[in-house]
Amino acid sequence: MLAILGFLMMLVFMALIMTKRLSVLTALVLTPIVFALIAGFGFTEVGDMMISGIQQVAPTAVMIMFAILYFGIMIDTGLFDPMVGKILSMVKGDPLKIVVGTAVLTMLVALDGDGSTTYMITTSAMLPLYLLLGIRPIILAGIAGVGMGIMNTIPWGGATPRAASALGVDPAELTGPMIPVIASGMLCMVAVAYVLGKAERKRLGVIELKQPANANEPAAAVEDEWKRPKLWWFNLLLTLSLIGCLVSGKVSLTVLFVIAFCIALIVNYPNLEHQRQRIAAHSSNVLAIGSMIFAAGVFTGILTGTKMVDEMAISLVSMIPEQMGGLIPAIVALTSGIFTFLMPNDAYFYGVLPILSETAVAYGVDKVEIARASIIGQPIHMLSPLVPSTHLLVGLVGVSIDDHQKFALKWAVLAVIVMTAIALLIGAISISV
């Protein structure tokens, strides 16, 4: 019963947001509440589940909210204007070079393994160029989202350590054969960027730029009075120090962004009224994304608290016919994206994956192959509304999450298919009939 309700809840949720009957925020909150009540849970129990889910995402929500404020202030001060001008002089107004450069930059920055950091750095560097040249921002969001999903499979990314720990396999044994698979995903992303960039070049042409972006151009989107050219070096050092601490992982991301934002605000805008105006300028974005993350916490809290996710996993495994047992690695590779789109990574890797692994072992499949297969679907996972950094990305770029999903999903599926094919070809995962 719980499994059926869980699947129905997912279908209703996706239908509501794809048809735009409800906003993502209201669908995230109301859909699980209704289905939990139908399942027989009381208001008090559902309330406790909601609070539990909110508590789990609270640190992430605070981090992202202050990260948006920090990078918003940095854009206001003009920190990124020289970099935008330099990049413009290199790409010479060619949309193709900019879009391909977006893919390369995303995957380079994503080597730190953190989606929020990757999105903030990539959008800060590239969005002004997209706005200045008229390139569709949805392309930036799509490339960054799918590219981050591919890089989430690196050994220190979000998926690989979970898969290794959930199944008790040696991380080195898991990741070694996956290196060519990850490389194929990266090449696929560059190829996709080339196709999209070529289409934008055909639409816009190569634009002649007579001067670099400045405060009066769309790239800056900020009035001269908020620029702080005399504090440029200070802001650069502060940002580099922040990024260095982020990469080191020695200090909480939430703590780092709260402190960095306060320092940046006080130094650049010591006047209290100016501080209020700058915070107000970015408050709508902060509120929209923060509320979305807390709503996602409500969804996952109820999904986990009602045990729907556990029952869904068991029912799906039981549906695999005995004669298809040897195909389980390929099935896991192709379905892991669907699973992790509909539920958080933790729920999949620690709830669903062990069941899939035990089933595969019964058919003579090595569990390390299941671990490898389970991380291939990450490009699709990173488009999920349950991933907090996804809301950060669409908020920074200025697109809706449903438009982002509609645009990027086909490219994410393509990346998963390519990576699965390469994994089968080189023997990282195997099938038998």
UniProtKB/Swiss-Prot annotation:
Keyword hit for Cell membrane: yes
Does the record's keyword annotation contain Cell membrane?
A: yes
Function description: Proton motive force-driven secondary transporter that mediates the transport of citrate complexed to Mg(2+). Cotransports at least two protons per Mg(2+)-citrate complex. Can also transport citrate in complex with Ni(2+), Mn(2+), Co(2+), and Zn(2+).
Native species of this protein? Bacillus subtilis (strain 168)
**Keywords recorded for this protein, A-Z:** Cell membrane, Citrate utilization, Membrane, Symport, Transmembrane, Transmembrane helix, Transport
Q: Which named protein is this?
A: Mg(2+)/citrate complex secondary transporter
- Pfam family, any one: CitMHS
Compartments where located: Cell membrane
Origin, by domain of life? Bacteria
Regulation (activators, inhibitors):
The uptake activity increases with increasing Mg(2+) concentrations. Inhibited by FCCP, TCC and nigericin.
Q: State what induces this protein.
A: Expression is under strict control of the medium composition. Induced by citrate, via the two-component regulatory system CitT/CitS. Repressed by rapidly metabolized carbon sources like glucose, glycerol and inositol, via the carbon catabolite repression system. Is also repressed by succinate and glutamate, albeit to a lesser extent.
Tell me where the transmembrane regions lie.
Answer: 2-22, 24-44, 60-80, 98-118, 131-151, 176-196, 247-267, 286-306, 324-344, 345-365, 379-399, 411-431
Q: Which GO terms describe its biological process?
A: citrate metabolic process; transmembrane transport
Q: How does it sit in the membrane?
A: Multi-pass membrane protein
- Give the family this protein belongs to, as stated in its UniProt record: Belongs to the CitM (TC 2.A.11) transporter family.
